[in-house]
Amino acid sequence: MRDPDALLVRAGVRGDPERDQHFLIDDRVLDRLPGYLPDSADTDHVLEIGGGTGALTDRLLDVADRVTVIERDPGLATFLTDEFADEIEAGSLTVIEGDALEVPLPDFTASVSNLPYGVSSEIAFRLLPEKRPLVLMFQQEFAERMAAEPGTDEYGRLSVTAGHYADVEVVEPVPKEAFSPPPAVESAVVRTTPREPPYEVPDDELFMRLVRAVFTQRRKTMRNAVRNTTHISGIEDAEAVVEAAGEDLMSKRAGNVPPEAFARLAAIAAEVDG
Protein backbone atom coordinates (compact mmCIF):
# COMPACT_ATOMS: atom_id res chain seq x y z
CA MET A 1 0.00 0.00 0.00
CA ARG A 2 1.17 3.52 -0.74
CA ASP A 3 2.34 5.48 2.31
CA PRO A 4 -0.05 8.40 2.96
CA ASP A 5 2.73 10.72 4.16
CA ALA A 6 4.78 9.98 1.05
CA LEU A 7 1.74 10.72 -1.11
CA LEU A 8 1.43 14.13 0.52
CA VAL A 9 5.08 14.84 -0.25
CA ARG A 10 4.76 13.72 -3.87
CA ALA A 11 1.60 15.77 -4.31
CA GLY A 12 3.29 18.81 -2.80
CA VAL A 13 0.29 19.66 -0.61
CA ARG A 14 -0.26 20.18 3.09
CA GLY A 15 -4.01 20.50 3.31
CA ASP A 16 -5.93 23.69 3.90
CA PRO A 17 -8.65 23.99 6.56
CA GLU A 18 -9.95 27.10 4.81
CA ARG A 19 -10.70 24.91 1.77
CA ASP A 20 -12.01 22.02 3.88
CA GLN A 21 -8.93 19.91 3.08
CA HIS A 22 -7.92 17.47 5.81
CA PHE A 23 -6.03 14.44 4.49
CA LEU A 24 -6.51 11.10 6.25
CA ILE A 25 -2.99 9.82 6.99
CA ASP A 26 -3.48 7.12 9.64
CA ASP A 27 -2.59 3.82 7.96
CA ARG A 28 -4.65 1.78 10.39
CA VAL A 29 -7.84 3.75 9.75
CA LEU A 30 -7.23 3.73 6.00
CA ASP A 31 -6.71 -0.03 6.03
CA ARG A 32 -9.95 -0.62 7.96
CA LEU A 33 -12.27 1.57 5.89
CA PRO A 34 -12.91 -0.81 2.95
CA GLY A 35 -13.60 -3.63 5.41
CA TYR A 36 -16.56 -1.77 6.88
CA LEU A 37 -18.60 -2.43 3.76
CA PRO A 38 -21.32 -5.02 4.50
CA ASP A 39 -20.36 -8.61 3.65
CA SER A 40 -23.09 -8.60 1.02
CA ALA A 41 -21.73 -5.48 -0.72
CA ASP A 42 -20.92 -5.72 -4.42
CA THR A 43 -17.42 -4.27 -4.92
CA ASP A 44 -17.53 -4.40 -8.70
CA HIS A 45 -17.50 -0.59 -8.93
CA VAL A 46 -16.64 1.47 -5.84
CA LEU A 47 -17.10 5.24 -5.81
CA GLU A 48 -14.79 7.49 -3.80
CA ILE A 49 -15.68 11.15 -3.34
CA GLY A 50 -12.80 13.44 -2.43
CA GLY A 51 -9.83 11.32 -3.47
CA GLY A 52 -7.23 13.76 -2.16
CA THR A 53 -3.77 12.31 -2.66
CA GLY A 54 -5.01 8.77 -3.18
CA ALA A 55 -4.25 7.05 0.14
CA LEU A 56 -7.76 5.60 0.35
CA THR A 57 -7.95 5.16 -3.43
CA ASP A 58 -4.96 2.82 -3.23
CA ARG A 59 -6.69 0.63 -0.66
CA LEU A 60 -9.97 0.57 -2.57
CA LEU A 61 -8.15 -0.64 -5.67
CA ASP A 62 -7.01 -3.61 -3.60
CA VAL A 63 -10.60 -4.75 -2.92
CA ALA A 64 -12.64 -3.47 -5.87
CA ASP A 65 -12.74 -4.47 -9.52
CA ARG A 66 -13.12 -0.83 -10.52
CA VAL A 67 -12.84 2.47 -8.65
CA THR A 68 -14.10 5.88 -9.71
CA VAL A 69 -12.77 8.92 -7.85
CA ILE A 70 -14.44 12.33 -7.98
CA GLU A 71 -12.03 15.10 -6.97
CA ARG A 72 -12.93 18.78 -7.20
CA ASP A 73 -9.39 20.17 -6.75
CA PRO A 74 -7.82 20.42 -10.24
CA GLY A 75 -4.29 20.01 -8.88
CA LEU A 76 -5.16 16.89 -6.92
CA ALA A 77 -7.13 15.43 -9.82
CA THR A 78 -4.03 15.85 -12.00
CA PHE A 79 -1.85 14.28 -9.30
CA LEU A 80 -4.15 11.27 -9.01
CA THR A 81 -4.09 10.85 -12.78
CA ASP A 82 -0.29 10.83 -12.76
CA GLU A 83 0.19 8.79 -9.57
CA PHE A 84 -2.21 6.06 -10.69
CA ALA A 85 -1.43 6.12 -14.41
CA ASP A 86 -0.93 2.35 -14.55
CA GLU A 87 -4.25 1.63 -12.86
CA ILE A 88 -6.03 4.06 -15.16
CA GLU A 89 -4.45 2.45 -18.22
CA ALA A 90 -5.50 -0.98 -16.95
CA GLY A 91 -9.11 0.21 -16.67
CA SER A 92 -9.38 -0.30 -12.92
CA LEU A 93 -9.46 3.41 -12.03
CA THR A 94 -11.28 6.46 -13.38
CA VAL A 95 -10.57 9.96 -12.08
CA ILE A 96 -13.27 12.60 -12.57
CA GLU A 97 -12.37 16.22 -11.92
CA GLY A 98 -15.45 18.03 -10.65
CA ASP A 99 -17.85 18.78 -7.84
CA ALA A 100 -19.58 15.67 -6.50
CA LEU A 101 -22.77 17.68 -6.09
CA GLU A 102 -22.84 18.58 -9.77
CA VAL A 103 -21.19 15.91 -11.92
CA PRO A 104 -23.23 12.87 -13.04
CA LEU A 105 -22.61 9.94 -10.71
CA PRO A 106 -21.35 6.71 -12.29
CA ASP A 107 -23.32 3.49 -11.94
CA PHE A 108 -21.48 2.53 -8.74
CA THR A 109 -22.17 -0.51 -6.55
CA ALA A 110 -20.80 0.91 -3.25
CA SER A 111 -19.05 4.01 -1.96
CA VAL A 112 -16.23 4.46 0.55
CA SER A 113 -15.28 8.10 1.06
CA ASN A 114 -13.63 10.57 3.40
CA LEU A 115 -16.04 13.40 2.64
CA PRO A 116 -15.30 17.13 2.69
CA TYR A 117 -17.07 18.07 5.91
CA GLY A 118 -18.45 21.36 4.60
CA VAL A 119 -20.67 19.54 2.10
CA SER A 120 -20.93 16.13 3.75
CA SER A 121 -24.68 16.39 4.37
CA GLU A 122 -25.44 17.35 0.78
CA ILE A 123 -23.25 14.58 -0.60
CA ALA A 124 -24.67 11.97 1.77
CA PHE A 125 -28.19 12.78 0.67
CA ARG A 126 -27.17 12.58 -2.94
CA LEU A 127 -25.78 9.09 -2.33
CA LEU A 128 -28.41 7.62 0.01
CA PRO A 129 -31.28 7.56 -2.54
CA GLU A 130 -29.03 5.51 -4.84
CA LYS A 131 -29.59 2.61 -2.39
CA ARG A 132 -26.00 1.39 -2.38
CA PRO A 133 -23.86 0.40 0.64
CA LEU A 134 -21.90 3.40 1.92
CA VAL A 135 -18.93 3.85 4.26
CA LEU A 136 -18.49 7.56 4.88
CA MET A 137 -16.37 9.72 7.17
CA PHE A 138 -18.19 12.57 8.92
CA GLN A 139 -17.75 14.93 11.81
CA GLN A 140 -18.55 12.85 14.90
CA GLU A 141 -21.51 15.00 15.94
CA PHE A 142 -23.05 14.67 12.47
CA ALA A 143 -22.45 10.90 12.49
CA GLU A 144 -24.14 10.49 15.87
CA ARG A 145 -27.16 12.52 14.76
CA MET A 146 -27.40 10.47 11.59
CA ALA A 147 -27.65 7.22 13.57
CA ALA A 148 -29.70 8.52 16.53
CA GLU A 149 -32.82 6.85 17.91
CA PRO A 150 -36.09 8.60 18.88
CA GLY A 151 -36.07 10.12 22.34
CA THR A 152 -32.35 10.97 22.34
CA ASP A 153 -30.92 14.49 22.20
CA GLU A 154 -29.24 13.70 18.88
CA TYR A 155 -32.41 12.47 17.15
CA GLY A 156 -33.72 14.82 14.50
CA ARG A 157 -34.47 15.43 10.86
CA LEU A 158 -31.12 13.92 9.86
CA SER A 159 -31.86 10.68 11.74
CA VAL A 160 -35.29 10.25 10.16
CA THR A 161 -34.25 11.06 6.61
CA ALA A 162 -31.11 8.90 6.68
CA GLY A 163 -33.05 6.03 8.24
CA HIS A 164 -35.63 6.30 5.48
CA TYR A 165 -33.07 4.88 3.05
CA ALA A 166 -30.84 2.62 5.12
CA ASP A 167 -29.79 1.10 8.41
CA VAL A 168 -27.22 3.53 9.80
CA GLU A 169 -24.37 2.61 12.17
CA VAL A 170 -21.43 4.51 13.61
CA VAL A 171 -18.65 1.93 13.26
CA GLU A 172 -15.53 3.78 14.39
CA PRO A 173 -14.59 7.07 16.07
CA VAL A 174 -11.57 8.70 14.43
CA PRO A 175 -9.33 11.13 16.37
CA LYS A 176 -8.19 14.48 15.01
CA GLU A 177 -4.62 13.22 14.85
CA ALA A 178 -5.53 10.81 12.05
CA PHE A 179 -5.65 13.78 9.67
CA SER A 180 -3.22 16.32 8.27
CA PRO A 181 -3.82 19.04 9.23
CA PRO A 182 -5.94 17.95 12.21
CA PRO A 183 -9.52 19.28 12.00
CA ALA A 184 -11.08 21.20 14.88
CA VAL A 185 -13.48 18.35 15.71
CA GLU A 186 -13.45 14.58 16.15
CA SER A 187 -14.63 12.38 13.29
CA ALA A 188 -16.44 9.08 12.90
CA VAL A 189 -17.04 6.45 10.24
CA VAL A 190 -20.65 5.65 9.34
CA ARG A 191 -21.86 2.55 7.52
CA THR A 192 -25.23 2.60 5.77
CA THR A 193 -26.84 -0.60 4.55
CA PRO A 194 -29.66 0.13 2.09
CA ARG A 195 -33.15 -1.25 2.65
CA GLU A 196 -36.73 -0.31 2.01
CA PRO A 197 -38.26 1.71 4.88
CA PRO A 198 -40.30 -0.39 7.35
CA TYR A 199 -43.36 1.73 6.56
CA GLU A 200 -45.09 3.14 3.50
CA VAL A 201 -45.31 6.79 2.50
CA PRO A 202 -47.62 8.19 -0.17
CA ASP A 203 -44.92 10.47 -1.51
CA ASP A 204 -41.24 10.68 -0.53
CA GLU A 205 -41.15 14.43 -1.17
CA LEU A 206 -44.13 15.11 1.10
CA PHE A 207 -42.64 12.89 3.82
CA MET A 208 -39.30 14.74 3.68
CA ARG A 209 -40.95 18.18 3.68
CA LEU A 210 -43.09 17.25 6.66
CA VAL A 211 -40.13 15.94 8.66
CA ARG A 212 -38.08 19.04 7.82
CA ALA A 213 -40.97 21.29 8.80
CA VAL A 214 -41.78 19.90 12.24
CA PHE A 215 -38.13 19.66 13.29
CA THR A 216 -37.78 23.42 12.80
CA GLN A 217 -40.01 23.60 15.89
CA ARG A 218 -38.83 20.56 17.78
CA ARG A 219 -39.51 22.15 21.19
CA LYS A 220 -43.20 22.59 20.38
CA THR A 221 -45.83 19.87 20.37
CA MET A 222 -46.50 18.24 17.03
CA ARG A 223 -49.90 19.95 17.04
CA ASN A 224 -48.34 23.41 17.02
CA ALA A 225 -45.45 22.39 14.78
CA VAL A 226 -47.83 21.14 12.09
CA ARG A 227 -49.93 24.30 12.36
CA ASN A 228 -46.96 26.68 12.28
CA THR A 229 -44.97 25.20 9.40
CA THR A 230 -47.37 24.81 6.50
CA HIS A 231 -45.14 27.15 4.46
CA ILE A 232 -42.48 24.41 4.64
CA SER A 233 -44.57 21.22 4.62
CA GLY A 234 -47.02 22.39 1.98
CA ILE A 235 -49.96 21.08 4.02
CA GLU A 236 -53.09 22.96 2.97
CA ASP A 237 -55.47 22.12 5.82
CA ALA A 238 -53.36 21.85 8.96
CA GLU A 239 -56.33 21.80 11.33
CA ALA A 240 -57.87 18.82 9.57
CA VAL A 241 -54.53 16.99 9.65
CA VAL A 242 -54.11 17.68 13.37
CA GLU A 243 -57.62 16.43 14.11
CA ALA A 244 -57.22 13.28 11.99
CA ALA A 245 -53.82 12.43 13.48
CA GLY A 246 -55.17 12.17 17.01
CA GLU A 247 -54.13 13.40 20.43
CA ASP A 248 -51.53 10.73 21.14
CA LEU A 249 -49.32 11.78 18.22
CA MET A 250 -50.12 15.50 18.27
CA SER A 251 -49.23 15.88 21.97
CA LYS A 252 -45.69 14.59 21.40
CA ARG A 253 -42.65 16.61 20.40
CA ALA A 254 -40.85 15.78 17.15
CA GLY A 255 -37.83 14.39 18.97
CA ASN A 256 -39.98 11.61 20.45
CA VAL A 257 -41.81 10.67 17.25
CA PRO A 258 -40.54 7.50 15.48
CA PRO A 259 -40.19 7.46 11.68
CA GLU A 260 -43.24 5.25 11.15
CA ALA A 261 -45.40 7.86 12.92
CA PHE A 262 -44.09 10.55 10.56
CA ALA A 263 -45.04 8.24 7.70
CA ARG A 264 -48.57 7.88 9.08
CA LEU A 265 -48.81 11.66 9.42
CA ALA A 266 -47.67 12.11 5.81
CA ALA A 267 -50.35 9.65 4.70
CA ILE A 268 -52.99 11.58 6.64
CA ALA A 269 -51.83 14.87 5.10
CA ALA A 270 -51.96 13.39 1.60
CA GLU A 271 -55.49 12.09 2.20
CA VAL A 272 -56.79 15.31 3.78
CA ASP A 273 -55.33 17.58 1.12
CA GLY A 274 -56.42 15.23 -1.65
From Swiss-Prot:
- Entry keyword rRNA processing: yes
| Keywords on record | Cytoplasm, Methyltransferase, RNA-binding, rRNA processing, S-adenosyl-L-methionine, Transferase
Which subcellular locations apply to this protein? Cytoplasm
**What InterPro entries is this protein classified in?**
KsgA/Erm, rRNA_Ade_diMease-like_C, rRNA_Ade_Mease_Trfase_CS, rRNA_Ade_methylase_Trfase_N, rRNA_adenine_dimethylase, SAM-dependent_MTases_sf
UniProt keyword annotation of Repressor present:
no
An annotated Gene Ontology molecular function: RNA binding
Q: What is its EC number?
A: 2.1.1.-
Please give the GO cellular component terms listed in this UniProt entry.
Answer: cytoplasm
Q: Which residues bind S-adenosyl-L-methionine?
A: 22, 24, 50, 71, 99, 114
Family to which the UniProt record says this protein belongs:
Belongs to the class I-like SAM-binding methyltransferase superfamily. rRNA adenine N(6)-methyltransferase family. RsmA subfamily.
Function of the protein? Specifically dimethylates two adjacent adenosines in the loop of a conserved hairpin near the 3'-end of 16S rRNA in the 30S particle. May play a critical role in biogenesis of 30S subunits.
Entry protein name: Probable ribosomal RNA small subunit methyltransferase A
Q: What organism does this protein naturally occur in? A: Natronomonas pharaonis (strain ATCC 35678 / DSM 2160 / CIP 103997 / JCM 8858 / NBRC 14720 / NCIMB 2260 / Gabara) (Halobacterium pharaonis)
